[in-house]
């Protein structure tokens, strides 16, 4: 699972490769076509692998939908999301244990368009700022909307870790389910 920080580093590396291509193209005897063919081929190969992996994963999700009841599928995807959240434990979640406001501030700086916390009501509402699904396994238009149950597991694991209390996550809106954005409502379980 790639995190946002690694993704941004990868983007920076590809930009640096583009700048390197420009510099190579300025050298005597070089053409822009031969100066960057390797970098462009590598980028194309990586993108092809990503696309193929996402399509295969979408097929895997479809197989799960056919073979498991809705209840079993939800548990499976929820557990998958919880496991994914664990990969962020050391780098993100543990830093904000007991500091939900600090976590929400970091989220607003990086991946949340909106975040509200009503401590008295025990609710947190998050609006993701990304115009596309942030899961690197998802290919919009191919991955079934049922896979959004995975992100509910991620949200529950992340917020229960930070708050030190069990929570329940609901999806108010989802890109995969036809929405314009992803919106989560997190409720602390009393």
Predicted feature locations:
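N-terminal secretory signal peptides and thylakoid transit peptides that target proteins
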Residues: 1-15
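C-terminal segment of N-terminal export signals and the immediately downstream linker at the start
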Residues: 21-62
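Amphipathic interaction/junction segments at domain boundaries or subunit interfaces
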Residues: 65-147
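Active-site nucleophilic cysteine motif
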Residues: 148-152
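Short secondary-structure junctions
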Residues: 159-167
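Short, solvent-exposed loop/turn elements at beta->coil junctions and helix N-caps
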Residues: 170-175
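C-terminal edge-of-domain segments
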Residues: 181-188
């Amino acid at each position: 699972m790639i995190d946002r920080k690694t993704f941004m580093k990868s983007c920076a590396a590809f930009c640096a490769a583009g700048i390197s291509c420009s510099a190579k193209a300025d050298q005597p005897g070089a053409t822009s076509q031969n100066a960057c063919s390797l970098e462009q081929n590598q980028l194309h190969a990586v993108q092809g692998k990503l696309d193929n992996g996402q399509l295969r994963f979408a097929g895997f999700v479809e197989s799960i939908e056919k073979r498991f009841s809705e209840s079993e599928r939800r548990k499976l995807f929820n557990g998958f999301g919880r496991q994914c959240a664990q990969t962020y434990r050391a780098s993100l979640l543990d830093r904000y244990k007991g500091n939900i406001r600090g976590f929400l501030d970091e989220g607003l700086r990086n991946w949340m368009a909106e975040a509200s916390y009503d401590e008295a009501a025990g609710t947190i509402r998050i609006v993701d700022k990304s115009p596309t699904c942030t899961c690197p396994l998802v290919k919009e238009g191919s991955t079934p909307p049922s896979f959004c149950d995975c992100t509910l597991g991620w949200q529950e694991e992340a917020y229960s870790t930070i708050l030190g209390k069990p929570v329940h996550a609901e999806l108010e809106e989802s890109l995969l389910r036809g929405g314009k954005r992803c919106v989560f409502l997190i409720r602390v379980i009393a």
